[in-house]
């Protein structure tokens, strides 16, 4: 085995080398970049990925004339890098200006006994020589120096010249013609932003990695943060517009440091003084963390080994979401027709909601309800105005809001209705899903949800869903409340008979029983009305909201009722440390405004009609579908369990770039973000039609 093979086969530990130098830059702004990134937690970010990381050393720029001082700095850096590689570490060099690359990559080559391939990610070519440079700043010269041309202070560092055939430059958009001619004459491959925009970064990165890692040989990565667009990374020495996005670059370099052939990583040109909000530092750390991240299969294995086995996810590891689209760790895009069980009704990373989250997070996040905050009253005011209820009690998850409603109902039963203490009954329906706490599980009819978790609280009853007569028969003088979903989502998108909720409302009113609607999934426009109960023109005594209320960013939920119900709560009766916090209140209030401003309720009704019409067309063309059910953008495809199963079909849709989820193995849930366009919805429906057509062709033919 060669020395190179031995080196690259070692299990790496990352060793940080900070370089406090701006000797090659026009200003000293980047001198403190390495130390600033250290304070921002760059070591911890790497440890989060499961790799070992430690700070090796910090190198200070020596005093003296500029070029001799730079030469001394480069020699010291090259020696440190060489020692790190030789001992099996992966050096992560943090600058400082890009001139330090002339030391980093000579050091790697010296350790290898041969030149590494080099992936150079930069807005600029940095391929000037002293004769061609307009500014004569050394940070514009390191790539030429590494190819053996330039000032002796930068070229006469121990280690081999780079092989131009194994150098690839990505992200370039600002350079002088002399630089491009210099690199072209030597055969260095340059991938500019125009090509990246035309072909996509993933395709360009694949070509670049094939160049730098040709013949299975070792390589490294030099990242000048100015490769990023200034909107993401303003804190750089020489910003240049129309650059790379952080998320797309993170995906493109994902896991590269775990590649046994990647021997070193370098990040340069970070200027803390120009990064008041810390955007650039976070971008740099995010990119390095992405390069250290395990691959999708490894991440699934880690979760399986370290997490509880209470979920069986579809085999995809998602890493980014924008609007109605999600991307996995490999950059594959998927249309989201699940929207996290309606939690992402406003789409992923809605710009207004993200801006509100970021702004509020820098002001005030959590104080507990021991004090007032300036955001909660405004949220409560808007929420009650919009829904028409007098009061709202904010908590976090849907489960908490359901528990809050049950507590309110029981105390109302005891203190207002006059039910004997500890005798207040709650009625729910078979097939319900209200959460998974002990009390709520006691209301469930699903055997798996109940198995092994008893005993459950007393005075909990269940009746058939959709049967108003069964409700009337179940009510006793001790009944405090009837808890019902307007549409049973987890139960299979089950819609009750027309007039059912109205009949239940009349029965409850006649017997002085609270009607509480669980609208955690159906509320806030999902079904084409603000509340799903409005389809039956009823106003429940209490409504439970959640999921979409947090804008897809935070867990926010609430129980809404009028004073006659909410009066039962006195200080100390109920609470939640995070419930009603300023951050959640700000985001939820903005989510309500987005709902109104973008007319998402009306949009859900219109697109929902299209969705259901197309699903019925698909069903008519296949024996695999037994029924189509839904309202608004909330639909279910029930399949014939004798012919197929919903999980298999969901996996087939995943393979075609569509994310859905089965429920109980027989129903495929369709609930896209309310922001989905007609074109996006049609694209997803076409994939659904194709999957059912393919599955139908595989059915055995009758004899």
Language-model-derived ranges and their functions:
Residues 297-703:
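Conserved N-terminal phosphate-binding loop of PLP-dependent enzymes in the Aspartate aminotransferase
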Residues 66, 133-134, 234-242, 343, ...:
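Short glycine-enriched, charge-decorated loop/helix-capping segments at active-site entrances
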Residues 4-92, 103-104, 110-113, 189-296, ...:
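Catalytic cores of soluble, metal-dependent hydrolases
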Residues 157, 173-194:
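Active-site-proximal loop/helix segment associated with metal-binding centers of metalloenzymes
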């Amino acid at each position: 085995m060669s020395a190179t093979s031995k080196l690259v086969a070692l299990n790496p530990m990352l060793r940080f080398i900070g370089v406090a130098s701006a000797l090659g830059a026009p200003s000293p702004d980047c001198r403190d970049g390495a130390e600033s990134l250290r304070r921002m937690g760059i070591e911890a970010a790497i440890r989060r990925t499961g790799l070992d990381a430690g700070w090796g050393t910090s190198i200070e720029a020596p005093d003296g004339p500029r070029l001799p001082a730079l030469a001394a700095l480069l020699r010291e850096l090259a020696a440190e890098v060489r020692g790190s590689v030789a001992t099996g570490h992966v050096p992560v060099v943090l600058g400082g200006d890009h001139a330090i690359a002339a030391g980093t990559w000579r050091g790697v080559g010296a350790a290898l006994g041969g030149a590494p391939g080099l992936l150079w990610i930069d807005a600029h070519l940095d391929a000037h020589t002293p004769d061609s440079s307009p500014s004569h700043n050394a940070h514009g010269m390191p790539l030429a120096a590494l190819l053996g041309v330039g000032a002796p202070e930068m070229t006469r560092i121990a280690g081999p010249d780079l092989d131009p055939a194994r150098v690839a430059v990505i992200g370039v958009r600002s350079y002088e013609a002399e630089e491009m001619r210099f690199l072209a004459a030597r055969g260095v491959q340059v991938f500019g932003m125009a090509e990246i925009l035309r072909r996509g970064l993933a395709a360009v990165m694949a070509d670049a990695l094939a160049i730098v890692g040709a013949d299975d040989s070792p390589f490294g990565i030099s990242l000048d943060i100015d490769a990023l667009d200034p909107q993401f990374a303003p804190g750089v020495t020489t910003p240049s517009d129309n650059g790379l996005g952080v998320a797309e670059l993170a995906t493109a370099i994902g896991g590269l440091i775990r590649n046994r052939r990647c021997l070193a990583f370098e990040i340069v040109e970070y200027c803390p003084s120009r990064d008041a909000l810390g955007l650039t530092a976070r971008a740099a750390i995010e990119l390095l963390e992405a390069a250290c991240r395990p691959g999708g299969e490894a991440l699934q294995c880690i979760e399986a080994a370290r997490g509880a086995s209470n979920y069986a996810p579809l085999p995809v590891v998602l890493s980014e979401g924008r609007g109605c689209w999600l991307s996995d760790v490999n950059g594959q895009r998927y249309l989201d027709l699940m929207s996290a069980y309606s939690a992402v009704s406003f789409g992923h990373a809605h710009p207004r909601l993200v801006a509100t989250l970021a702004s509020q997070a820098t002001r005030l996040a959590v104080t507990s309800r021991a004090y007032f905050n300036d955001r909660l009253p405004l949220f409560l005011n808007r929420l009650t105005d919009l829904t028409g209820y007098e009061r709202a009690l904010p908590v976090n998850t849907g489960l908490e809001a359901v528990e809050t409603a049950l507590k309110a109902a029981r105390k109302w039963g005891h203190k207002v209705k006059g039910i004997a203490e500890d005798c207040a009954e709650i009625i729910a329906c078979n097939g319900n899903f209200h959460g998974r706490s002990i009390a709520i599980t006691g209301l469930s009819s699903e055997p798996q949800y109940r198995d092994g978790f008893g005993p459950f609280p007393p005075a909990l009853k269940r009746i058939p869903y959709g049967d108003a007569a069964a409700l009337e028969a179940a009510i006793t003088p001790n009944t405090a409340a009837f808890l019902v979903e307007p549409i049973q989502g987890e139960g299979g998108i089950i819609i009750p008979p027309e007039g059912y909720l109205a009949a239940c409302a009349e029965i409850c009113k006649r017997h002085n029983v609270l009607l509480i609607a669980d609208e955690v999934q159906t509320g806030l426009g999902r079904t084409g009305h603000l509340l799903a109960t409005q389809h039956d023109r009823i106003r429940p005594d209490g409504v439970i909201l959640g999921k979409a209320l947090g804008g897809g960013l935070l867990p926010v939920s609430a129980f809404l009722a009028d004073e006659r119900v909410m009066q039962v709560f006195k200080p100390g009766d109920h609470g939640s440390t995070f419930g009603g916090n300023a951050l959640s209140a700000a985001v939820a209030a903005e989510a309500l405004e987005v709902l109104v401003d973008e007319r998402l309720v009306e949009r859900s009704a219109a697109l929902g009609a299209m969705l259901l019409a197309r699903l019925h067309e698909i069903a008519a063309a296949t024996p695999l579908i037994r029924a189509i059910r839904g309202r608004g953008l909330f639909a279910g495809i029930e399949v014939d369990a004798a012919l197929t199963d919903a999980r298999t079909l969901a996996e087939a849709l995943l393979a075609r770039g569509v994310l859905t989820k089965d429920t109980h193995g027989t129903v495929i849930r369709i609930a896209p973000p309310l922001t989905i366009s007609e074109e996006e919805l049609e694209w997803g429906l076409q994939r659904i039609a194709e999957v059912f057509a393919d599955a139908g062709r595989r059915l055995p033919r009758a004899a």
